[in-house]
Amino acid sequence: MRKRFLGAMLLALGISLFGGWGSAQANSVPEPTQSMLHVCWLKDSHVNPAACEVVRMPEAFEPAKAVVTSSVDFPDFQVVALDLREVTEEGYPIFNVQSIYYKDFLRATEPIIIVMRDSESFPRNGIAVRDSLGRERIFGIAISGEDGSLLLSEVDR
């Protein structure tokens, strides 16, 4: 119990200090990849759900439906399950990442709906894409504590 509490405190400290879920975001030069990806609640989107592919996470919470869109085509798109593995001494969370769904490309014209797992204080749902330099980038889908909207935040494996 005490270990869990300390881990949660370190996680909160890392988030508040670095503004993200992982050191990848805090230590890398920002690249437009994250700004080209968008996530929002299905109820807040302007997409026709009947025209979208739907991916269900294991242990999905039916009302928690997110829409992922992009302004460009991204290769090697994945929907991933995130599980907190550890929090480093510096307060960075490290996640186990399991691919749930793979698609050759996330196309700008083809939004995807994700029926997500229930989230707690850290993201349990995410996406991965390959950026313009060929690197895999993993983003957790988190709920904003300010307005309840969805946010993408880069995470470490």
Tell what function each PLM region has.
Residues 79-97:
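Short, surface-exposed beta-strand/strand-loop-strand elements in extracellular ectodomains
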Residues 100-133:
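Short, solvent-exposed, Trp/other aromatic-anchored flexible loops in extracytoplasmic proteins
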Residues 1-9:
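Bacterial N-terminal signal peptides that target proteins for export
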